């Protein structure tokens, strides 16, 4: 048998081993790959929606919005039949979907306001504060005046709740922010402030506001009318604001037009170069109250 001598391969000999520089590069590459995988998992991993104390989005929200829009444009106001209700719905939803419901801005609803164009005739605008039901009864019977909820955007959203969540492209049907949660920039509040501002800016001629005279402060500075609408009336288009201070027909009657609260409203209006007028228990509206209380002394006609 031939004699063969086997020698040990020197560890210092270059072979298949990686250089130290290559080892470092490979290690860095692996770390980056692991980091990328972690990021992808975090992004794609389903997260639980934020939990709030308030009631959730109204069930069948999209169906209600679309249905109301069609009723309004095809039946109630056929002159607006050219409005695209499906586009209005999708634009509305984009204002709050996939967003933190406490970080909604006026700009989020700007495309919706721009999309829906509606002209309210001069002298036909009626604002209200703490008198919603009575104001709506009046415009429904009177037929020619408009509250905010008699406009298309106000009509489709009236009495609904909605919010989204940054973790999903759907609406939050579990909970939405409650007014007590220090979340003033929520989807509902911002929406009404935005369209209230537009409603006031578009008003012209003589405008009316229906106030609740049964309250200690018929004019409330923190209400939508007191904080948004009255300050967005354009004095170049509106020359007079008439306040109708309505009292509960079964309550104590008082001269609310001379109260400090109404005088504050008068001061605001006058400083903005508009005329102010006030009337307690505006008679046409009083008649509506009398329908349910026909025997009340204030409802009896002197024949």
From Swiss-Prot:
Topology Extracellular: residue spans: 45-303
Function noted in UniProt: Synthesizes the second messengers cyclic ADP-ribose and nicotinate-adenine dinucleotide phosphate, the former a second messenger for glucose-induced insulin secretion, the latter a Ca(2+) mobilizer. Also has cADPR hydrolase activity. Regulates osteoclastic bone resorption, probably via production of cyclic ADP-ribose and triggering of a cytosolic calcium ion signal through ryanodine receptor activation.
Catalytic activity annotation: NAD(+) = cyclic ADP-beta-D-ribose + nicotinamide + H(+); nicotinate + NADP(+) = nicotinate-adenine dinucleotide phosphate + nicotinamide; NAD(+) + H2O = ADP-D-ribose + nicotinamide + H(+)
Disulfide bonds: 69-85, 102-183, 163-176, 257-278, 290-299
Record's protein name: ADP-ribosyl cyclase/cyclic ADP-ribose hydrolase 1
Quaternary structure note: Homodimer.
Organism: Rattus norvegicus (Rat)
GO molecular function, one term: phosphorus-oxygen lyase activity
Gene that encodes the chain: Cd38
